[in-house]
Amino acid sequence: MGNLVIAVDGPAGAGKSTIAKIVAKKLNINYIDTGAMYRAVTYKCLKSGIDVNNEKEVIQIAENSDIDFKDNNIYLDKEVINEEIRTIEVSNNVSNVAKIKEVRQLMVEVQRKIGMKNSVILDGRDIGSYVFPDADYKFFLVATPEERGNRRYKELCNKGYNTTLEEVIEDIIRRDEIDSNREFAPLVKANDALEIDTTGKTIEEVVEEVVSKINL
């Protein structure tokens, strides 16, 4: 059997990363968090004092960044940045970086190279619709903004961030708007993707639903 490619798409907070990680372990295949790649570029921009709305400078940062995945870690220029890319500041700015066409093209190139070498499950916004339109399996996870906001809020509180549920939900809705309306490779459900509403479901229930659809 050749390499297996599984695409998991959906808006912020729908549970893509959590579900994809567990499915990857169950199927013993590699997991690629494509959103983390855009977060890495965003983090580097913020760390370098670059305005994320300055497309030219953001593209330069992306071109000069070495992003890699190994043993469930994401590396930026040879350093592990798992926690650094999960801050509120990065979350609030990542959609502005991810909407830049040239940045997406650079990241997609890396994603496709990884997918050609190994069996993978990738999660993101445009995996099934653009990065791997011929993926073997495509899933599109959704949930209400309130449910997604609640999940993100709990996650941030556990990390010690001082924010409100209202602010988190507002940010989720704002990111949906940017992701869905960007010109290049927007957040969209592929025609042949299976939509799963994760609202009110446990992680185990969603994982079981995904795994049950995959024939190895």
Curated annotation (Swiss-Prot):
Disulfide bonds: none annotated. CDD domains: CMPK (cd02020). Pfam families: Cytidylate_kin. It catalyses: CMP + ATP = CDP + ADP; dCMP + ATP = dCDP + ADP. GO terms for molecular function: ATP binding; CMP kinase activity; dCMP kinase activity. InterPro entries: Cytidylate_kin (IPR003136), Cytidylate_kinase_dom (IPR011994), P-loop_NTPase (IPR027417). This is Cytidylate kinase. It comes from Clostridioides difficile (strain 630). The gene is cmk.
